[in-house]
């Protein structure tokens, strides 16, 4: 892109060519024949095509070279690096250009949670890996993934190998993870953030009023906690939503402080006092309050390693390098498989394969797993805030049919709420992370009216004909009348009734109990276990162990991941679309605005009934 701009500037600076009058030529002597013009044009097309082909081959060879496994040997004395700034995802990335940065024309690593957990487990008994070094400025993992990887590092310590952490600056989540280390170090001129947890909601009502956009909200009266629609008709949190969010951040902060308290032997009361008084900002203050052990530069950390833990011949081993060095897991019988299916993203109607859950596409994957005789049990990793009620029900049906044939265990990620919980309900067991956002058993509809705003600001008007009184219902030009509103509410109430009944059936709970804990309320994983929406708290490995036990597979089984692959040009175009969005997200303020615009687009962009939870850790700090 930069080269193109420079080239355009150079061309612009050149003086305009002086027109030259052609010399008179005798008839029949012209050298500019049709054949030559056609040949030149054809040659230009061919050369241009070859240049593009070479460019794409270069890109794919770069990506391919990066993705080759087993090419870099592991040193005999290595220290495994966990770089918290590198992305770790729930599900394998679907696009063929994953890890390729078009701004720098280079590749960056992206790892899956399951592979990282497998690598840390392998490192326990790998004599070449002497310890773990935690570092990185930034955060490439969600809090739920942080918790699972942190637990794996805690287990790694049982091997007797060392774990140390060093950061220039500590964010709250970085410290939550790094507190697992035997020794924690900070840069002498770094900083420390310890402030507690807060959550913020953006409200659009004032903007909509100024624009003249009216929004009809369809929400059952009992769904008072279903707050996804509140930004469209309120200017601040409702009392119910405020209570819900306060409960969430309290539970989240409680998990952070209890974990740090245990790791650093500091009372929860003292940790809260530090946050209330902003006592820890400077490195010296972090040492004084026993959050870190010492201030060290990177070279001093290296010297410490070679003095106390390893020899000077050691080498760092990147996590992606170590994952690539591990042989594919081929142990266990190929005829006794535990399949991992990923349900990652917002739930939408139809078919597709990007960063959303398409109802028909996931349903087809579930059907394939159900009819595969080699698959004896299924773990579904759900990381979804919900979405389309219809798509959720399509997936639910296939999950129910699957559960009737073989054990199904849900592993909840960052969130498995609303529609995400809807599709989880039929499972034999539900495993939630302690900080999973789940529940949100409720429903709503939203119908924006933009006609008056378009006329006021742009002079656009609408007119038409119809055969019946309500033939133009839902087109967005006029608000719903009383009859139309009642008709829409019948559909909303029907979805809520079905949602609560299938949860009662799937979780073996009285309907009255489900109605009491539903109302659209969001629960943390620990709370979900207490009220019966989850069976236990744990990660994906816990879910796998439960699935193995329910299928009575013993030790002779194999883990397989069932993925939806996209091939050819469609995959490339989807990838480029994802890349463009990621560039926006790379700037925090722009990223937050983009997230808010995406929410508006989801609901205002098309009329419908939704089972959706508005919260994610991107809005919780």
Short names for language-model regions:
Residues 342-345, 382-384, 412-414, 427, ...:
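Active-site proximal loops enriched in glycine and acidic residues that flank catalytic Cys/His/Asp
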Residues 69-79, 332-333:
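Membrane-proximal juxtamembrane linkers immediately C-terminal to transmembrane helices
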Residues 1-41:
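N-terminal Lys/Arg-rich, disordered targeting/topogenic segments
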